[in-house]
C-alpha cells in the first residue's frame, strides 16, 4: 500500500515564499510528469521524513494535491549540506502500467568465508539502475556474499530479479569482490552512483524576489 502525502499548491518560487514555507515546517517541491501539468507545491517536512523512514527513497507514494491523487516517485531530494535539513523535493507522476528507470540501493547480505580468512571485502557498486513497473520497485536489492572466498567476485549477472525487473548494467560488471589481505592498502572503495536527474530544473529555486 502506497504511503500518502498531502500537498498544497504555492503561487510562486520567490525566495521570500520559500523561506516562509520552510519556517512553517514545510518543504517546497515540484510535481511533474508526462500526463500531468507541472505544479509548484509544498509538503510537510515531518510527513516526508516519515515517508522516507518507512519506505525509503525509492518507495511509491500517493500525492494528494488540489483534490487529485497522483502515484509519484521521489526523483530528487535536496538537503542543506551543513545542517542536513530538507530544502526541496521533486516528485514525478508515473503511469502504473509503464516501466520506469530508477536507481536502487545494493545491500550485501551474509558473511563471506573469504573475509573470515583475512580477505578484504570491496563493494564496487552501491546502486543498480533497473527498469521496473512502479508497483514492483524493490526497497533494496540484496546480494548474497555468503559463498565468496578470497579472490571471488559477485557480478550483476548473479543478481536474482525473480522476473520483476531488468537491470540496466552489463552482466559482467562487478558488484563486490574479496581481495587478498596484502591488497588491503590498494582498495578503491568505489563511489556511490549518482541518482538519475529529473527533467525539471526548478528544484534549484534561487530566483530572487521580483
From Swiss-Prot:
This is one of the proteins that binds to the 5S RNA in the ribosome where it forms part of the central protuberance. The keyword Transit peptide does not apply. PANTHER family: RIBOSOMAL PROTEIN L25/GLN-TRNA SYNTHETASE, ANTI-CODON-BINDING DOMAIN-CONTAINING PROTEIN, RIBOSOMAL PROTEIN L25_GLN-TRNA SYNTHETASE, ANTI-CODON-BINDING DOMAIN-CONTAINING PROTEIN. Belongs to the bacterial ribosomal protein bL25 family. CTC subfamily. It comes from Geobacillus kaustophilus (strain HTA426). The gene is rplY. Residues 201-210 have a biased composition (Basic and acidic residues). InterPro entries: Rbsml_bL25/Gln-tRNA_synth_N (IPR020056), Ribosomal_bL25/Gln-tRNA_synth (IPR011035), Ribosomal_bL25_b-dom (IPR020057), Ribosomal_bL25_C (IPR037121), Ribosomal_bL25_long (IPR001021), Ribosomal_L25_dom (IPR029751), Ribosomal_uL5_bac-type (IPR020930). NCBIfam families: bL25_bact_ctc, PRK05618.2-4. GO terms for cellular component: cytosolic large ribosomal subunit. This is Large ribosomal subunit protein bL25.
